[in-house]
UniProtKB/Swiss-Prot annotation:
Annotated source species: Prochlorococcus marinus (strain MIT 9301)
Role of this protein: Redox regulated molecular chaperone. Protects both thermally unfolding and oxidatively damaged proteins from irreversible aggregation. Plays an important role in the bacterial defense system toward oxidative stress.
Protein name, entry field: 33 kDa chaperonin
Gene: hslO
Cellular location(s): Cytoplasm
Pfam family, one: HSP33
């Protein structure tokens, strides 16, 4: 199933609802970064969180960056997502594995809290106009969903509910995604809407299972929480949008990065190696900068 974002509203436009599926994007990241099951889930959660935030941006080239700086063995993460549905990212320790934690008599979960440890979630919103807006909040417990909800509460003062989860089987992750429900800014002082949001979200007992059952129809996932969504509240074109792992790196960007080195540094590379290989942190694509290209950079700085 193609990864996708689906949007809807409820309560006569007072509540915004967004659901996202990030299974294929998470698996692509696993392949590119050689992730463990644990880090695949963590990065998938961060993909879902960043795409949910980016979904509200008004311009298609708007972007959201999530960065976690913490003292846990994951060694942080960085994710970049666009309003266009493109997402990329990486973690500091891709092959991290930890013992599962028991959550009830027959269920176990990854230890996200131990993996991330204590630290901060940094959110950067870049609309492409003016300076990006940056906000930082302390990590709540490292499960990404509650950390994102904390950001929305403290930085945007928006009554929100965030659900993020995944489904794992022996072969690995088979489903990843999330859902965001928000009282819209002009309605956020309406106690009835805030109460409605709280009551509906209390009825969610197992989001990961709901996500798995609705992975082929995200609108049905939204309707499980808000069965009375507004009819035709959003145009069909705007309601559904494809999502994919996509990096912006290129050979030209690599050349530009090399060109920022001092002449002496370029000469040293030319003398020792004769060429340079640059590896993109986000997607692991490799770009070879050959002898002639480095020589031209040196000549241009002379």
């Amino acid at each position: 199933m193609q990864d996708r974002i689906v949007r809807a509203t409820a309560a006569n436009g007072g509540i915004r609802l967004v659901a996202v599926l990030t299974t294929e994007s998470s698996l692509e990241a696993k392949k590119r970064h050689d992730l463990s099951y644990l880090t695949t889930c963590i990065l998938g959660r961060a993909f879902s969180a960043s795409l949910l935030l980016a979904s509200s941006m008004k311009i298609m080239h708007g972007r959201v960056t999530l960065r976690v700086r913490s003292d846990g063995p994951l060694k942080g993460l960085l994710v970049d997502a666009g309003r266009d549905g493109k997402v990329r990212g990486y973690v500091g320790n891709p092959d991290l594995e930890l013992d599962l934690v028991k959550i009830d008599s027959n269920k176990y979960s990854f230890d996200f809290t131990k993996a991330l440890g204590t630290g901060y979630l940094n959110v950067i919103r870049d609309s492409g106009i003016g300076e990006p807006f940056t906000s930082t909040v302390e990590l709540v417990n490292g499960n990404i969903a509650e950390d994102l909800a904390s950001y929305l509460y403290h930085s945007e003062q928006t009554p929100s509910a965030v659900f993020i989860g995944e489904k794992i089987q022996n072969q690995g992750i088979i489903c990843s995604g999330g859902l965001l429900a928000q009282v819209l800014p002009k309605k956020d002082t309406d106690p009835l809407l805030v109460s409605l949001l709280e009551e509906r979200c209390k009825e969610v007992n197992s989001f990961s299972e709901d996500l798995f059952q609705s992975k082929d129809n995200l609108l049905s996932l939204i309707k499980k929480i808000f069965p009375d969504i507004d009819d035709e509240s959003i145009s069909e074109k705007a309601r559904s949008q494809e999502v994919s792992f996509k990096c912006k790196c290129s050979k030209q960007r690599s050349l530009n990065a090399m060109n920022m080195l001092d002449k002496s540094e370029l000469e040293d590379i030319l003398k020792k190696d004769g060429n340079a290989e640059l590896v993109c942190e986000f997607c692991k694509n490799k770009y070879l900068i050959n002898y002639e290209e480095i020589k031209l950079m040196i000549e241009n700085q002379s």
